[in-house]
Amino acid sequence: MEYQYPMDVDWTTEEKIAVISFFQAVEKAYEKGIPKQELLDTYKRFKEIVPSKAEEKTHCAAFEKESGYSPYRTVKTAREAEESTIIRM
């Protein structure tokens, strides 16, 4: 797919990489599956960078609009899944 990840110009390179890693984990859940803990670990790091719920919604909505993949539904599914589960959307 050809699209851009939502970014904030004030983020460091390391923070941008972490945010991209989270969005790539969401992509992986849709495309082939990802271990629950791997997805939740990338989400935890994403939340360290984007602690505001409003800002999270803005970035996730932009990503969903570009890709068609829902970070919200993916994380919700992972949280509700049993341990050692592969998350597939």
Curated annotation (Swiss-Prot):
InterPro entries: BH2638-like_sf, UPF0223. Coiled coil: none annotated. Pfam families: UPF0223. HAMAP family: UPF0223. Belongs to the UPF0223 family. This is UPF0223 protein BPUM_1362. It comes from Bacillus pumilus (strain SAFR-032). The lineage of its organism: Bacteria, Bacillati, Bacillota, Bacilli, Bacillales.
